[in-house]
């Protein structure tokens, strides 16, 4: 699985001429994940050629303004231009309270189906089959999360051994990759003998924090 990272904002409390407030997009193909949503996020997405309705999940590190001020506009955009009109948002309990205020102030709640998940402990909190999502609390004075996205390890066929045994593509290969032994031309072939484990990629996003063990 290809993973592409786009830095949308790398400034801090005050944006500069060259840099916007916090925002990172991780493109995993079917999943397009936004980490933090600083001021002018819609503009940054447009510059990067990323359509807001394509975003599937938003992960907020903490509830300081430079990490969330772009959220109302982004949600309005998705509500108006997304066919599904829904999005998954994750963050701290404190951020969840501010998100409710955003719903009320901008009357967004009835326009789009927003599912908010509060992260209350360290570790994996979501498994989609292909990806695992986890978080750890950092050291920032207020509840603040660092996130990671891990691609699952995959069983792959050793093509050299496949060619040597003259194994055909198709059901036989599928069985071997699903950890099942097969019989081919009267010979039993053990899946462990012709496969290897390809370790999945892992991307960690650690934003505002002092040095702490959770950030490593």
What are these regions (language model features)?
Residues 94-105, 114-121:
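A gly/proline- and charged-residue-enriched helix-loop-helix capping module
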Residues 131-205, 209-216:
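Active-site-proximal loop/helix segment associated with metal-binding centers of metalloenzymes
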Residues 10-11, 39-40, 63, 94, ...:
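Active-site metal-binding loops of divalent metal-dependent hydrolases
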Residues 1, 50-53, 112, 129-131:
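Structured loop/turn residues at beta-strand edges in well-structured enzyme cores
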Residues 39-90, 115-120:
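Active-site metal-binding motif and surrounding structural segment of the metallo-beta-lactamase
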Residues 1-48, 84-86, 147-149, 196-206:
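Conserved beta-strand hairpin/beta-sheet module of binuclear metal-dependent hydrolase folds
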Residues 8, 122-127:
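Local beta-strand/beta-hairpin segments that build beta-sheet-rich folds
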Residues 14, 65-67, 123, 141, ...:
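Active-site environment of divalent metal-dependent phosphoester hydrolases
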């Amino acid at each position: 699985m290809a993973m592409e990272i786009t830095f949308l904002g790398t400034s801090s409390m005050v944006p500069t001429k060259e840099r916007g407030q916090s925002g990172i997009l991780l493109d995993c193909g079917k999943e397009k994940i936004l980490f933090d949503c600083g001021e002018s996020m819609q503009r940054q997405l447009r510059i990067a050629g990323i359509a807001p309705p394509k975003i599937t999940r938003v992960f907020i590190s903490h509830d300081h303004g430079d990490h969330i001020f772009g959220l109302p506009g982004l949600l309005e955009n998705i509500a108006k231009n997304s066919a599904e009109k829904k999005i998954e948002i994750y963050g701290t309990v404190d951020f969840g309270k501010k998100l409710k205020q955003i719903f009320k102030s901008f009357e967004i709640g009835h326009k789009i189906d927003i599912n908010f998940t509060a992260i209350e402990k360290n570790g994996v909190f979501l498994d989609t089959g292909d990806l695992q999502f986890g978080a750890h609390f950092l050291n920032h004075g207020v509840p603040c999360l660092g996130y990671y996205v891990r691609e699952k390890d995959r069983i792959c066929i050793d093509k050299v051994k496949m060619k040597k045994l003259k194994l055909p593509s198709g059901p036989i290969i599928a069985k071997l990759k699903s950890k099942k032994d097969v019989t081919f031309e009267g010979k039993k072939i053990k899946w462990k003998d012709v496969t290897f484990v390809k370790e999945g990629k892992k991307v960690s996003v650690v934003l505002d924090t002092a040095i702490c063990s959770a950030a490593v």
